[in-house]
């Protein structure tokens, strides 16, 4: 990974040795050996140019770093001089870059500085250039010609066997030639990579997976895009293999790459694992720093730094990439800002420890702002009215608030210190209504992180409430005295309240002072006071997160509404579980009223938070918020009653439907039984019908047979009668002529034949 020149340790600066040149490339080559005095060797130290120069600190020599090889293959010119002649590397002063066919390794001359004004350009000609030279000198006369010649001859550079080729382990920044188009290389397989199927080819016995497909599956949500992946590959010195046309066609058909894409690259599994680990490692992300840290590093926004979350801008998150000079400058500025932020953080931690030490000296009863914790930089009389109080703490037990600009070096006796001390809860948190950003909601955070910080703040407030509930068991009583506090003018409010911003013509300084007096007659013990510590939840803690001055940006309303929902639920639970029962509480609730408007308060209104001697804008705002909370509670109760009624109605409907369903199911069962009985009867009837049909057919056949027998008997009887009647006639006719007898016999025979037939 490249680093700025200013950060390279001197151990990596290898002193140049006298070059020993050997060449056997073509006819007409001259082998020149020159000493360090005759030819200027490539300088590796930082150049004396005007801007910051970035170059790679890899060692130049391959094994012993003892000899630098320069092969001159061009003709014509005096090699070895300071001018860029035909066979020497163009590093000298006065002249230009190497001429003709010089085959110079750009790694050897990465930081040359032409003393004559035009030198320093390294040209690569002759068709065997290894890569695009890094032009890091002030005079860049021949850099364009060298880059054009190197890009045109990139195919031959990868297979060049000259001694001046790229050094081992050095990435080649020109596009390598694609894979050879052979059937073995074009055989695609679907392999399993981290639980997903990825297309792969086997090239020269090495399994290579499709880089764009692996990017879509595993890296898309980790980096900005595929260009970032290629930047990482260059930095990791990984050269992906370029697909040939047939492989691209196959990958398009498989859906591994999008239709219309005509190029693709392959990468080995080992290199992909290296790339994946680099993408998932937060300290190695290249590129410019995030936007929120750019504003932090600027000097005019240095006061934002203490409010940023630690870890958002760590030293490793913005590494110098070695690509541009601006990146190096940004990295230096970032390091300075980080160091300053660490100092500020250390000061804050020390101040917090001092605060807790002084708090323990004056009594360990630190109950939710008993140290005159104020709301909106006014007096903390709410806690005096509502919370069991502790023994009075002197104004000397104060600290310097580290988060207020302009108040970092005040003496302990300064009145601002006591005021700032009164803004701190026992667990080290500031009250959410104070006129400065909350430490858990940094100004430089995006809105998504604000939600996270708010949830963390609610969690911390719950812990504080539990501690307060544990301490409330034995509260000592204290006589209250009137307190008048003013905000010091040299601590301007970074975030004024909403009412101050909305009111035309108003200024934040108009509400800087609020005098709040409490009557000396109110000397009752803390046990007789209104029990706002119901279930260990103080009103102060309940309203955490509702003040709009701690919400950055346009998200104020959303977050305030969100927290109001939560707080209304808390108040609802409190009112349901522990109602106000003491007579003192009822009396004080009925007695107090808004003197400015003459309006009596409703019975359940939290009036101990109101003071008739003059309400500041923030107190008015909080009064409005409490009214809104009461309305929200009433609405929630009404909605809950409505929901209960609807539930009851739905339950009754459900029971009715269930009874109706059971009745219908019984009827259905009876119908099914009846149907089964009828079907059985039908089967019996069918069987009886079939038997009767068979009997009928049998009787019909018998009848027909009987009729035929009767007919045959009747025909034989008629024949006998005819024979008896014809016999006398025949005898009478015999006496007649023979002809008549024969005729009669024939007629009789015919008659007999016909009767027998019938």
From Swiss-Prot:
Any one GO molecular-function label of the UniProt entry: DNA-binding transcription repressor activity, RNA polymerase II-specific
Keywords on record: Activator, Coiled coil, Developmental protein, DNA-binding, Nucleus, Phosphoprotein, Repressor, Transcription, Transcription regulation
Residue ranges of the region described as DACHbox-C: 616-696
Region (Disordered): 1-105, 134-185, 280-302, 358-414, 474-532, 544-564
Region (Interaction with SIN3A) residue spans: 627-706
Phosphoprotein as UniProt keyword: yes
Start-end of Polar residues biased regions: 174-185, 292-301, 358-380, 387-399
One Gene Ontology cellular component annotation held by this UniProt entry: nucleus
Comp. bias (Basic and acidic residues): 555-564
Function, as annotated: Transcription factor that is involved in regulation of organogenesis. Seems to be a regulator of SIX1, SIX6 and probably SIX5. Corepression of precursor cell proliferation in myoblasts by SIX1 is switched to coactivation through recruitment of EYA3 to the SIX1-DACH1 complex. Transcriptional activation also seems to involve association of CREBBP. Seems to act as a corepressor of SIX6 in regulating proliferation by directly repressing cyclin-dependent kinase inhibitors, including the p27Kip1 promoter. Inhibits TGF-beta signaling through interaction with SMAD4 and NCOR1.
Protein name: Dachshund homolog 1
Lineage: Eukaryota, Metazoa, Chordata, Craniata, Vertebrata
Gene: DACH1
